[in-house]
Amino acid sequence: MRRNTKKLLKLVTTALLVVLCTSLLFRTFVSYQMLDYVPGGSFLPRAPRDAANDVAAPRVFSKPAAATGDKASELKAVAKPSSDAGGSTEKDRDWHNYPQMQKEASAKGPGEQGLAFFLPAGLEQKKEQLYKVNGFNALASDFISLNRSLPDIRHPGCRKKRYVKELPTASVVVPFHNEHWTTLLRTATSVLNRSPPGLIKEIILADDFSNKDQLKKPLEDYIAKHFTNVHVVRATKREGLIRARLMGARQATGDVLIFLDSHTEANTNWLPPLLEPIAKDYRTVVCPFIDVIDYETFAYRAQDEGARGSFDWELYYKRLPLLPDDLAKPTEPFKSPVMAGGLFAISRKYFWELGGYDEGLDVWGGEQYELSFKIWQCGGTMVDAPCSRVGHIYRKFAPFPNPGIGDFVGRNYRRVAEVWMDEYKEHLYHRRPHYRHLDPGDLTAQKALRKRLNCKSFKWFMEQVAFDQPSKYPAVEPPDYAWGEVRNEESGLCIDTQFKGQNERFSLAPCLKDQRGRSGEQQLVLTWHKDVRPAKRSVCFDVSSSDVHAPVMLWSCHGMHGNQLWKYDTVTKHLFHPITANCLDCDAKSHEVFMSICDSDVRTQRWLFEHVNETALANW
């Protein structure tokens, strides 16, 4: 009897081990089987999986639920809500969704916690196929859960911040054209997962005439199965980003319109900081901090810790430093002259009082200036909310073909300038003379709107709102410090940025003047902003590490010094980087460009500009 019992126990134990091993092997297998083959040679992602490969669709709530103080051990840094925490009153509340935060704190898997994800070997061909049509690593996105967790990178004070108890409802409008399946659905999923219960009235996916089959019936079927407050509206012809936003906004029923791009991820408690300023004054427009989702690995990181939006006189978006009062209150909204683009919240009532977007603007470009100028000049206020953070994929390249309607961006800029910029438009035309000859279309309705709303002058905007812009981006620019080719004394080679883009490295190459027939980008400028950039482009030499041999990257010029501040020494011929106290160096054999400890005896650190403004450098 005893022997039979032992045999039985042994059999049961063996069976349990077999079941457990089979389960683990199955999970490992399915986590990498993210794509189903569809006839026609394409791959359709399956329904999303979380780190445990068993994720329920995001919950939908019909009314706000009471705040909870339940937290995971991972959230010890978050202050426990209490009736007297942070000077709270009966009129405010803690809007954090602690159960969701607790769930995310323990999530593990590809891309979880916003970590970089690297594809397994053998998928290069499939990766490149998707890269070409998306401008980012869409295959990596397919391996990452739609419900993926993100790091809470807000200022610590945001975790204790309370907001008014009664907040308006929001309609989130997401325009898209041929967006990749998983990035589009992750956008919607992140909004629902990280928004307090009951505040999201609806998510409207505004389809700008996509032609991908999976964005038609498969998308509608998926939404019908997994969501109740997400729906798609479709254009019957290609309208462009601006009119697609308007199409979605016209379907909205929430108190507040929130516009997001179709490859974004809302972060922890992102919504209350956007809604509270509008609840207090419906003519306040609120923008979140925009974080970076890496286009290659989907790693999530901060772009910076705040700056005020602005522009130069070619209407490139620029940034102004925070004011001292803003720096002293790092969790409070601060005024900003210009929004960065398409991520913002605005009262639905106020949006239509302002006439929405100008429907005469084609495709994209200029709409952020048109709306920003209109808000400020017509009695509104615009702020950035540091405690609201949304990640955004900045594509490696634009995958969509030119619509074939000429210089639509220039036309849009002229349209904005003629309606809103008054005499200041001449500064734009001085830099872009051909804009004068572009047909802006009929401006009658827009000029009548400005008159009806009794809007202020652009001079008022420049003096009262963007008052410090002339010191950073003057209408009449001072002379640059140095320009032309930059030749290394040791190697005789020139710095060649090779038309590289943001977050890319560059190197040395034979000087174009020495070898005719070669192509490259060797005309550089040490500008009056004290940055170094390719002539006629707005990407700058950027160093983010003080390590020896640190790389030099190209990054969008921000005019705020820091990583992009450079000084040229006409005696030592050094290109000195003050924030790291290192000098530009190179390897003559590998042609690599990097940073090193400054040494006047090292010839690889000596750089010869083709033209030098000695007077300007003497007054640097």
Residue ranges and their predicted role:
Residues 168-173, 202, 370:
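Cell-envelope/extracellular polymer assembly enzymes that use nucleotide-activated donors
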Residues 236-252:
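Glycine-rich, basic loop-to-helix element that forms the pyrophosphate-binding segment
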Residues 470-620:
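Lectin-like carbohydrate-binding module/patch detector with strong preference for beta-trefoil
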